[in-house]
């Protein structure tokens, strides 16, 4: 499965989503590794098997094994960190912010790819997962590394599109299941 096949799976009620996916696929704002790592990380964050399979197929040959692994690591480590740090951020009791997290996250310091790419992927996954504290932290690191606000916005736009693709496909499948009853 590829992005083209994925587009065909998007129901007509989500035509805008289909068009956004087409625009994202042809967007050349980001470098190849940055873009395809971003697509893989955000696809994984949607938790939709069809989306993940299509994006991984699309990324095949465009990402080195190290970059593919790093993109998957970004999604995995953010799945943990986004829950923990969203709690720390939202809890009324601010004592939690002073406590050690006691979570292993060595991959952040040594992702095996360009640090800015990994941070951008982590920021996009954090946007999907809704962790404001993580978003702020990754944005700060990216800006210090010289990544433009336009590139950051592109990453978050891609995350938004990827999430909407997953939701649209799931909504279409649910509609078909109901119609079949």
UniProtKB/Swiss-Prot annotation:
Keywords: Antioxidant, Disulfide bond, Oxidoreductase, Peroxidase, Redox-active center. The keyword Oxidoreductase applies. One of its GO terms (biological process) is cell redox homeostasis. Gene3D superfamilies: AhpD-like. Its EC number is 1.11.1.28. The active site is at residues 131, 134. Disulfide bonds join 131-134. This is Alkyl hydroperoxide reductase AhpD. GO terms for molecular function: alkyl hydroperoxide reductase activity; disulfide oxidoreductase activity; hydroperoxide reductase activity; peroxiredoxin activity. Pfam families: CMD. It catalyses: N(6)-[(R)-dihydrolipoyl]-L-lysyl-[lipoyl-carrier protein] + a hydroperoxide = N(6)-[(R)-lipoyl]-L-lysyl-[lipoyl-carrier protein] + an alcohol + H2O. The lineage of its organism: Bacteria, Pseudomonadati, Pseudomonadota, Alphaproteobacteria, Hyphomicrobiales. Belongs to the AhpD family. The keyword Disulfide bond applies. Antioxidant protein with alkyl hydroperoxidase activity. Required for the reduction of the AhpC active site cysteine residues and for the regeneration of the AhpC enzyme activity. InterPro entries: AhpD (IPR004674), AhpD-like (IPR029032), AhpD_core (IPR004675), CMD-like (IPR003779). HAMAP family: AhpD. It is an enzyme of class 1 (oxidoreductase).
């Amino acid at each position: 499965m590829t992005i083209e096949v994925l587009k065909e799976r998007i129901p007509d009620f989500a035509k805008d989503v289909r068009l956004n996916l087409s625009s994202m696929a042809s967007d050349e704002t980001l470098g190849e590794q940055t873009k395809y790592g971003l697509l893989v990380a955000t696809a994984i964050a949607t938790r939709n098997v069809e989306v993940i399979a299509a994006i991984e197929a699309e990324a095949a040959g465009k990402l080195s094994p190290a970059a593919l692994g790093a993109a998957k690591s970004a999604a995995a480590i953010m799945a943990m960190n986004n829950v923990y740090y969203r709690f720390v951020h939202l809890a009324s009791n601010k004592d939690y912010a002073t406590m050690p997290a006691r979570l292993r996250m060595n991959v952040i310091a040594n992702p095996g790819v360009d640090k800015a790419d990994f941070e951008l992927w982590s920021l996009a996954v954090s946007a999907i997962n809704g962790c404001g504290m993580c978003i702020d932290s990754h944005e700060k690191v990216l800006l210090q590394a010289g990544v433009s606000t336009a590139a950051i916005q592109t990453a978050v736009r891609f995350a938004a599109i990827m999430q909407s693709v997953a939701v649209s496909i799931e909504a279409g499948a649910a509609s078909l299941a109901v119609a079949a009853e």
